[in-house]
C-alpha cells in the first residue's frame, strides 16, 4: 500500500466527514494509543486489515478508492 495515497485519501474523506484531526479519526477505531495510531499513519502497511476497514468505514470511503489504496 502506498503511504502517500493512503494519507491523501484519508485526508480528503476526513474533510468531507468534518473530522479535522487524526485524534478524532483514531477515536472512531479500536486503536488504543496515539503512539500506535501514529505508527500506522506513518507506515500504513503495518495496519491490521480489521483496523483499516474501521478507518475506511468511518470515513465512508467508496469501494473504488479502497481498491486503489490496496494496489
Sequence positions of predicted segments:
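Residue-level signal for the short linker/turn that defines the boundary of a DNA-recognition helix
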Residues: 19-21, 32, 50
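A short, Lys/Arg-rich alpha-helix, primarily the initiator
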Residues: 1-26
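Recognition helix of helix-turn-helix/homeodomain-like DNA-binding domains
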Residues: 30-47
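Short C-terminal boundary/hinge segments that cap the last helix of small helical domains
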Residues: 60-71
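Residues in the recognition helix of alpha-helical DNA-binding motifs
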Residues: 13, 28, 39-40, 69-70
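Core residues of bacterial helix-turn-helix
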Residues: 29-30, 59
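The alpha-helix within a helix-turn-helix
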Residues: 26-27, 56
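Short, basic-rich loop-to-helix N-cap that marks the start of a DNA-contacting helix
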Residues: 43-57
